[in-house]
Amino acid sequence: QRFNFRDFDNSFYQYRIGLFDENVWFAYRRIIKSLLMQNYIMIMWGNSNQSFSIEFQDEVNNIIKEIKDDVAFGLKENATKVN
């Protein structure tokens, strides 16, 4: 999965410099969010997040916050428990 996140980091960079439209990035973002709902992916991210760009780390941390908020408000009943 680290390879996927390396690709996501590159895609986020391309989005930030204007090579990807917002709707393209949001499609990637939905994939990232669905992956992060799996506990082993969350662990992988926690163990290797520092090897990604600061901007991408911030974006993923925002996605993690969204997941936690969704779980707290009962919007994701089947989501793996997020620490």
Regions flagged by a language model, labelled:
Residues 1-83:
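Amphipathic alpha-helical "stem/stalk" segments
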